[in-house]
Amino acid sequence: MVATNSVAKRTGNISAGTSAFAMIVLEKELENVHPEIDMVTTPSGELVGMVHTNNCSSDINAWVSIFEEFTNSLGMEISRDKLFTVLFNKALEGDTDCGGLLSYGYFSGENITGVNEGRPLFVRTPGSRFDLANFMRIHLASAFGAMRIGMDILKSENVQIDRLVGHGGIFKTPEAGQRILASAMEAPVTVMDTAGEGGAWGIALLAAYMMDRHGKSLENFLAEDVFGQDQGITITPSAEEIAGYQIFMSRYREGIDIEKTAIHQLQEKGVIENAGTTERRSIPSKS
């Protein structure tokens, strides 16, 4: 919140990395209790509704590693930064509804969707528009799918948001993650030059505030002394992008049972064949 200057009412920040969360500063308490929404506060005590998702970019990272392995096998030395840039920019060429593709980047369970374990999935029909652009776009869109469900809960409580700021690793490549997030939130999303900075920088700003606030509120200190005229770059989604993401979300909600079935049918066990016998063993988690 502090690192993105999102401590005033009707502002919010979205952090997107291995996991993701949206923190919206509320004008009043929510009327109902929602287990999907965590209630916290800003450092100055304003009430915040937090939508937290356990999964975001891990599956994207895994797919980028596959592309990296492929390019290495061709004898090409391409940096991961270059791969991310090329692949994320390719996503911008995809259909707004992701071409009928579906993915769940669930490396772990997801409370908001009622899934208790993770099975990363990529699913398509024979008629889906399967190309690289849609493949990358679906994984970016899916990274914000569970969060969108949580934000819909806040919307049902008539929570008003004037400004959303994104930060975290997924925004290091300009535009792609930001534009798809804006489509998911159905609202403008701003990303600052400090998008890659997070908690450590926010803590440093709080320390500076405690030492040199001159009677100012935290909100005014950040606005006047820290961020000043740095308003970042804002992307507003088009009507077509919003409509496309809504179509994707309908598919995402309906497909949750596929994820649940995969959990039941696909157990994390490996198979070792030894002297004509088959022995099963658990595969250690990489996390």
Ranges and model annotations:
Residues M1-S285:
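Active-site core segments that coordinate phosphate-bearing ligands/cofactors
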